[in-house]
Amino acid sequence: MKNSGGNVNTFIGFNAGFENRVGESNTFIGFDAGSENRSGSRNIYLGTSAGTGIVHGTKNVFLGYQTGYNASRSGSANVFLGYQAGYDELGSNKLYIQNDSTAIPLIYGDFATNQVGIDTKSIPTGYHFAVAGKIAVEEVLIGLESSWPDYVFNVDYDLPTIREVETFIAQNGHLKDIPTAEEVQEHGILQGEMDAKLLKKIEELTLYVIELNERIQTLEEAVNSETTE
């Protein structure tokens, strides 16, 4: 033990906290746990070789065999749970929940950006959650920032004519305001926004059906009138 000024530390296990100089309020339990820590404080390392390699990091919580092993010498505020979780991680403010040393854990998080990934570390900017693969849910509530298209039923709504719709489809191969297959494949869709766009088309279609029904009724009345004469 090379402690020269560190206080309120608990080191249990051969070589645990061996290099500590001035680090304080650390709890290292297990063979070689936190053995290279010198100035890092307020860390909890539980498990054989947990936190080995970290020298100055603070506020880390590691639980499991070789958690945080060979991670950044100054990595701080990391939470690693599971066998070899966070192995070789060079950053700070990270969450790893995993049972091996893979670089892409089952659950990954970044406390600095409030992001969480399942089987992925690639979380797009502006999003808090990402999943690599399919998900099954029983219910999803989507909040919309854009307006819901009830305005289609306003008397001043400029409803395109059927001929205009036909012309647009002939020229572009898709409905107006609806992304193309290529755009969806490249960028994906925002579910709430797409639901609103599809509802708009359904409401427009409803207006066309109402108009068509009125024309049919007019024709039927004309036919019936001629028949009775």
Show where each model-derived region lies.
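Glycine- and small/polar-enriched repetitive beta-structure motifs of secreted/surface proteins
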Residues: 1-126
